[in-house]
A protein has these predicted regions:
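N-terminal pre-Walker A segment at the start of P-loop NTPase domains
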Residues: 1-17
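Hydrophobic anchor at the beta1->P-loop junction of P-loop NTPases
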Residues: 27
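P-loop (Walker A) phosphate-binding loop of NTP-binding proteins
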Residues: 30
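Conserved lysine of the Walker
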Residues: 35
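Hydrophobic positions on the alpha1 helix immediately C-terminal to the Walker A/P-loop
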Residues: 38
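Short glycine-rich substrate-engagement loop in P-loop NTPases that contacts/grips substrate
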Residues: 57-89
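Conserved catalytic/switch belt of AAA+ P-loop NTPases
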Residues: 103-119, 132-133
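Interdomain motor-coupling "hinge/lid" segment immediately C-terminal to the ATP-binding subdomain
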Residues: 124, 128-175
Protein backbone atom coordinates (compact mmCIF):
# COMPACT_ATOMS: atom_id res chain seq x y z
CA UNK A 1 0.00 0.00 0.00
CA UNK A 2 2.97 2.29 -0.10
CA UNK A 3 4.94 4.03 2.60
CA UNK A 4 2.29 5.36 4.92
CA UNK A 5 2.64 6.10 8.59
CA UNK A 6 0.66 3.53 10.55
CA UNK A 7 -1.32 5.58 13.07
CA UNK A 8 -1.89 2.83 15.58
CA UNK A 9 -3.96 4.88 18.05
CA UNK A 10 -6.69 5.22 15.40
CA UNK A 11 -6.41 1.72 13.93
CA UNK A 12 -6.78 0.20 17.40
CA UNK A 13 -10.03 2.13 17.93
CA UNK A 14 -11.34 0.92 14.58
CA UNK A 15 -10.24 -2.65 15.33
CA UNK A 16 -12.07 -2.56 18.66
CA UNK A 17 -15.37 -2.18 16.79
CA UNK A 18 -14.75 -4.96 14.28
CA UNK A 19 -17.71 -7.26 13.77
CA UNK A 20 -20.01 -5.12 15.91
CA UNK A 21 -22.54 -4.94 13.12
CA UNK A 22 -25.05 -2.91 15.10
CA UNK A 23 -22.66 0.03 15.34
CA UNK A 24 -21.57 2.27 12.47
CA UNK A 25 -17.96 3.35 12.87
CA UNK A 26 -17.71 7.02 11.80
CA UNK A 27 -14.21 8.39 11.22
CA UNK A 28 -14.22 12.18 11.22
CA UNK A 29 -11.64 14.93 11.02
CA UNK A 30 -10.52 17.86 8.95
CA UNK A 31 -9.62 17.38 5.30
CA UNK A 32 -6.19 15.91 4.57
CA UNK A 33 -5.58 14.69 8.15
CA UNK A 34 -5.22 11.04 7.07
CA UNK A 35 -8.70 9.50 7.39
CA UNK A 36 -8.60 7.85 3.97
CA UNK A 37 -5.17 6.32 4.54
CA UNK A 38 -6.29 4.98 7.92
CA UNK A 39 -9.32 3.40 6.23
CA UNK A 40 -7.14 1.89 3.47
CA UNK A 41 -4.76 0.48 6.08
CA UNK A 42 -7.70 -1.07 7.90
CA UNK A 43 -8.99 -2.66 4.67
CA UNK A 44 -5.52 -4.10 4.13
CA UNK A 45 -5.57 -5.50 7.68
CA UNK A 46 -8.88 -7.19 6.94
CA UNK A 47 -7.39 -8.83 3.85
CA UNK A 48 -4.30 -9.98 5.75
CA UNK A 49 -6.51 -11.46 8.48
CA UNK A 50 -8.16 -13.71 5.90
CA UNK A 51 -11.26 -11.75 4.90
CA UNK A 52 -11.88 -12.55 1.21
CA UNK A 53 -11.61 -9.60 -1.17
CA UNK A 54 -15.24 -10.09 -2.21
CA UNK A 55 -16.38 -9.53 1.37
CA UNK A 56 -14.77 -6.07 1.52
CA UNK A 57 -16.53 -3.21 -0.23
CA UNK A 58 -14.35 -0.10 -0.28
CA UNK A 59 -15.82 2.95 -1.99
CA UNK A 60 -13.82 6.17 -2.21
CA UNK A 61 -16.34 8.71 -3.46
CA UNK A 62 -13.54 10.99 -4.65
CA UNK A 63 -12.31 8.37 -7.16
CA UNK A 64 -13.53 8.68 -10.72
CA UNK A 65 -15.14 5.23 -10.82
CA UNK A 66 -17.48 6.10 -7.94
CA UNK A 67 -18.31 9.72 -8.77
CA UNK A 68 -21.46 8.58 -10.58
CA UNK A 69 -22.92 7.59 -7.18
CA UNK A 70 -24.63 10.82 -6.15
CA UNK A 71 -27.71 9.70 -4.18
CA UNK A 72 -28.56 7.20 -1.48
CA UNK A 73 -30.64 5.25 -4.03
CA UNK A 74 -27.64 4.87 -6.34
CA UNK A 75 -25.45 3.87 -3.41
CA UNK A 76 -28.02 1.34 -2.21
CA UNK A 77 -28.24 -0.17 -5.70
CA UNK A 78 -24.45 -0.45 -5.93
CA UNK A 79 -24.16 -2.03 -2.48
CA UNK A 80 -27.11 -4.38 -3.01
CA UNK A 81 -25.31 -5.89 -6.02
CA UNK A 82 -22.19 -6.59 -3.94
CA UNK A 83 -23.47 -7.63 -0.50
CA UNK A 84 -23.83 -11.38 0.00
CA UNK A 85 -26.64 -11.88 2.55
CA UNK A 86 -25.08 -15.18 3.68
CA UNK A 87 -21.65 -13.74 4.58
CA UNK A 88 -20.23 -10.96 6.71
CA UNK A 89 -19.52 -7.95 4.51
CA UNK A 90 -17.21 -5.12 5.51
CA UNK A 91 -18.46 -1.87 3.98
CA UNK A 92 -15.97 1.02 3.98
CA UNK A 93 -17.30 4.29 2.56
CA UNK A 94 -14.73 7.07 2.19
CA UNK A 95 -15.90 10.71 2.02
CA UNK A 96 -19.59 9.81 2.05
CA UNK A 97 -20.79 13.35 2.81
CA UNK A 98 -21.17 14.23 -0.89
CA UNK A 99 -23.80 11.53 -1.45
CA UNK A 100 -27.28 13.06 -1.17
CA UNK A 101 -29.20 11.57 1.78
CA UNK A 102 -26.20 9.42 2.77
CA UNK A 103 -27.70 8.89 6.21
CA UNK A 104 -30.56 6.87 4.67
CA UNK A 105 -28.05 4.42 3.20
CA UNK A 106 -26.24 4.13 6.52
CA UNK A 107 -29.48 3.43 8.35
CA UNK A 108 -30.35 0.71 5.83
CA UNK A 109 -26.87 -0.81 6.13
CA UNK A 110 -27.10 -0.72 9.90
CA UNK A 111 -30.30 -2.77 9.69
CA UNK A 112 -28.40 -5.49 7.79
CA UNK A 113 -27.11 -7.85 10.47
CA UNK A 114 -24.24 -9.09 8.31
CA UNK A 115 -22.73 -5.68 7.42
CA UNK A 116 -19.87 -4.15 9.39
CA UNK A 117 -19.94 -0.47 8.36
CA UNK A 118 -17.18 2.16 8.43
CA UNK A 119 -17.45 5.67 7.00
CA UNK A 120 -15.29 8.78 6.77
CA UNK A 121 -16.36 12.34 6.29
CA UNK A 122 -14.91 15.80 6.50
CA UNK A 123 -17.46 18.56 6.42
CA UNK A 124 -20.10 20.02 8.70
CA UNK A 125 -22.59 17.26 7.82
CA UNK A 126 -20.40 14.90 9.81
CA UNK A 127 -20.16 17.00 12.97
CA UNK A 128 -20.63 14.87 16.06
CA UNK A 129 -23.47 17.06 17.31
CA UNK A 130 -25.48 16.16 14.20
CA UNK A 131 -24.50 12.51 13.78
CA UNK A 132 -27.00 11.18 16.30
CA UNK A 133 -29.89 12.87 14.54
CA UNK A 134 -28.69 12.04 11.02
CA UNK A 135 -27.90 8.38 11.61
CA UNK A 136 -30.67 6.35 13.15
CA UNK A 137 -29.19 3.54 15.16
CA UNK A 138 -25.98 3.24 17.05
CA UNK A 139 -22.68 4.71 15.97
CA UNK A 140 -19.30 5.47 17.39
CA UNK A 141 -17.17 8.39 16.30
CA UNK A 142 -13.41 8.18 15.90
CA UNK A 143 -11.99 11.66 15.45
CA UNK A 144 -8.69 11.86 13.57
CA UNK A 145 -6.35 14.78 14.18
CA UNK A 146 -3.36 16.06 12.20
CA UNK A 147 -0.03 14.44 12.97
CA UNK A 148 1.38 14.87 16.45
CA UNK A 149 4.97 16.08 16.62
CA UNK A 150 6.25 12.56 17.30
CA UNK A 151 4.27 11.20 14.31
CA UNK A 152 5.63 14.04 12.16
CA UNK A 153 9.20 13.12 13.16
CA UNK A 154 8.56 9.45 12.46
CA UNK A 155 6.96 10.12 9.08
CA UNK A 156 9.77 12.36 7.89
CA UNK A 157 12.48 10.25 9.55
CA UNK A 158 14.01 13.20 11.39
CA UNK A 159 16.87 12.76 13.81
CA UNK A 160 17.39 16.45 14.61
CA UNK A 161 14.51 17.17 16.99
CA UNK A 162 15.00 20.96 17.04
CA UNK A 163 15.07 21.29 13.25
CA UNK A 164 12.04 19.02 13.00
CA UNK A 165 10.12 21.10 15.53
CA UNK A 166 10.77 24.34 13.65
CA UNK A 167 9.57 22.74 10.41
CA UNK A 168 6.55 21.25 12.21
CA UNK A 169 5.60 24.72 13.46
CA UNK A 170 6.05 26.20 9.98
CA UNK A 171 4.33 23.45 7.99
CA UNK A 172 1.82 21.98 10.43
CA UNK A 173 0.87 18.41 11.07
CA UNK A 174 -1.04 17.47 7.94
CA UNK A 175 0.42 14.31 6.42
Amino acid sequence: MGDYLVREQYLSKIRAGRDDTGVIKVITGMRRCGKSVIMELYAEELRRSGVPEGDIIFIDFEKFEFQKIKTSEQLNDHLHQRINPDRRTYVLLDEIQDVKDWELSLSALNAEKNCDVYVTGSNSDMLSSQLATRISGRHTEIEVFPLSFSEYMEMHKYTDREKAFIEYLECGGLP
